[in-house]
Design a protein with these regions (language model features):
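A structural signal for hydrophobic alpha-helical transmembrane segments in multi-pass membrane proteins
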Residues: 1-69, 325-342, 346-355
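Transmembrane alpha-helical segments and their membrane-water interfaces
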Residues: 15-48, 89-104, 142-151, 270
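Membrane-interfacial helix-loop-helix modules of multi-pass inner-membrane proteins that assemble, modify
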Residues: 43, 57-82, 181-192, 228-230
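Hydrophobic alpha-helical transmembrane segments
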Residues: 48-69, 121-125, 167-176, 294
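Hydrophobic alpha-helical segments of polytopic membrane proteins
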Residues: 109-124, 130-179
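A juxtamembrane structural motif centered on a specific transmembrane helix
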Residues: 111, 301-374
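Hydrophobic, glycine- and aromatic-enriched re-entrant/interface helices and adjoining loop segments
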Residues: 156-259, 283
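Loop-to-helix entry and N-terminal half of a specific, functionally important transmembrane alpha helix
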Residues: 273-314, 320
Length: 374
């Protein structure tokens, strides 16, 4: 009920958009959730190229025919705009299928996975957003660490842990030194994390206003009166109704309301990880851990942003934010997750098929020319 009350009313553009999300995209997302629930999740392991190629085609179409907005290309399909920020949520699952198929290559497959993860990060940084990069790094990093500990690629676990840590260090260094130069206000945003009041009318403006609004919030109920600037941020036309939904709930209904939302999400993640780690199949564990890590990264990015730590823009609060693309994708991921929990107990891993075969199409040996069509 609290969340339904945050739906804007009126005839403005935000109210119209929110009505579309509630009455059009929400039923469509629920239908997608049901469809993904009954889909055999092994599809992503048997056909690991489908999702990455699909994302590549969408990005190509957005680059050629999309509308430039907010520094990125948006693909417009009628009244539906594909958000590049939300589309980045699918990249961890796309990597998961390829990572599973690379098991057949042993140590070489693990190294190739690290290179592939770096390529994904660079692609996300150019075609999507820095939030998507961090979400992917977290999800892929956890997946590679679990694979190393459980010896899914090779029996020499310590070697893979060392390679994993080295890859993480390289990615962190890359992101730290690359991002501020890649984005115009990178250094200013980094500065506002520590001293948001240093530039209250510039890059630290939103952070300062959010902290002021939260300082007027109470334990339960409506917050104390704020100035005209903060009051404007809390109107129906404000982004506090979408990207900063927790801050909105905290001010209007108290810290208890936002605490309940965070607690429910924490319980969902806790039960999900507990179920995921009990999966008997390797691919079932991979898919479930990847999706749960994606949800976790979304929440970990969303909460600090709502507390006024404005380093990067949040992607979405899973299942609750108004964004049509984010809602659609999160519901689809939840459907795949429950599909794993539904059939994961009976699913058995098949022998991995190598992506890179050692056999040659044409061979010359002992004066004989052999052509293999296998």
């Amino acid at each position: 009920m609290l969340l339904l009350k945050t739906i804007p009313a009126g005839n403005d553009a935000l109210a119209t958009r929110s009505a579309q999300v509630l009455f059009v995209f929400l039923p469509l997302s629920l239908a997608t959730f049901v469809g993904m629930y009954f889909l055999d999740f092994s599809f992503f392991g048997k056909h690991p190229y489908v999702l990455p190629l699909g994302l590549l085609m969408v990005d190509l179409a957005a680059h050629l025919f999309g509308v430039f907005y907010g520094g990125k290309r948006w693909l417009i399909l009628g009244s539906f705009a594909l958000s590049p920020l939300a589309l980045s949520l699918l990249f961890p699952l796309a990597f998961c299928g390829l990572f599973y198929r690379l098991r057949s290559q042993g140590r070489r497959g693990y190294l190739i996975s690290g290179v592939l993860a770096a390529v994904f990060c660079l692609f996300l940084s150019y075609c999507h957003t820095f939030s998507g990069v961090l979400t992917f790094v977290f999800s892929a990093g956890v997946l590679m660490l679990v694979a190393s500990k459980k010896k899914w690629f090779d029996k020499q676990r310590n070697m893979f842990l060392l390679l994993f840590l080295l890859a993480v260090v390289c990615l962190i260094v890359l992101l730290m030194f690359y991002a501020p130069f890649r984005y115009r206000y990178g250094w200013e945003r980094l500065y506002t994390v520590f001293v948001p009041s240093g530039d209250p009318m510039g890059s630290g403006y939103l952070s300062t206003q959010l902290k002021t609004v939260l300082s007027h919030s109470v334990f339960l109920g409506e917050g104390a009166a704020v100035s005209g600037t903060q009051a404007y941020l809390l109107t129906d036309a404000s982004m506090l109704r979408s990207d900063y939904l927790l801050a909105y709930l905290t001010y209007h209904y108290g810290w208890v309301a936002s605490g309940i939302v965070v607690l429910l999400l924490a319980v969902f993640l806790g039960l999900g990880f507990r179920k995921a780690l009990k999966q008997k199949s390797i691919f079932g564990q991979m898919v479930s851990l990847t999706i749960l890590c994606t949800f976790t990264a979304e929440i970990l990015l969303y909460i600090p942003a709502n507390l006024g730590i404005w380093l990067i823009a949040p992607i979405a609060l899973p299942f609750l934010s108004y964004g049509a693309t984010a809602l659609f994708i999160n519901m689809a991921l939840a459907g795949v997750l429950l599909s794993v929990f539904r059939t994961g107990e009976v699913y058995r891993d098949t022998a991995p098929h190598p992506i890179f075969s050692d056999s040659k199409f044409i061979q010359w040996a002992d004066g004989k020319l052999t052509i293999s069509f296998k």
